[in-house]
Amino acid sequence: MVKLLVRDRETIQEAVRRFRKLVERSGIKKEMRRREFYEKPSETNRRARLRAERRNKRTRMLSR
């Protein structure tokens, strides 16, 4: 959970900007997007497998 204490003489716009940065860094938005819809375990495994294949392909191409 992200907590933000508004500093002395800090405008609302500055506080909101700081809050957005904290949320982005904590990964909350990314996690919300990922959990927005249910994904079958087979789809999760498939996505992970494809990501690993791409990563391996990239490392093989770079090592040549």
Swiss-Prot record:
Residues 37-53 have a biased composition (Basic and acidic residues). InterPro entries: Ribosomal_bS21, Ribosomal_bS21_sf. The keyword Ribonucleoprotein applies. It comes from Rhodopirellula baltica (strain DSM 10527 / NCIMB 13988 / SH1). It holds the Pfam family Ribosomal_S21. Keywords: Ribonucleoprotein, Ribosomal protein. Disulfide bonds: none annotated. Residues 37-64 are annotated as: Disordered. GO terms for biological process: translation. This is Small ribosomal subunit protein bS21. The keyword Ribosomal protein applies. Belongs to the bacterial ribosomal protein bS21 family. One of its GO terms (molecular function) is structural constituent of ribosome. GO terms for cellular component: ribonucleoprotein complex; ribosome. Residues 54-64 have a biased composition (Basic residues). It comes from the Bacteria.
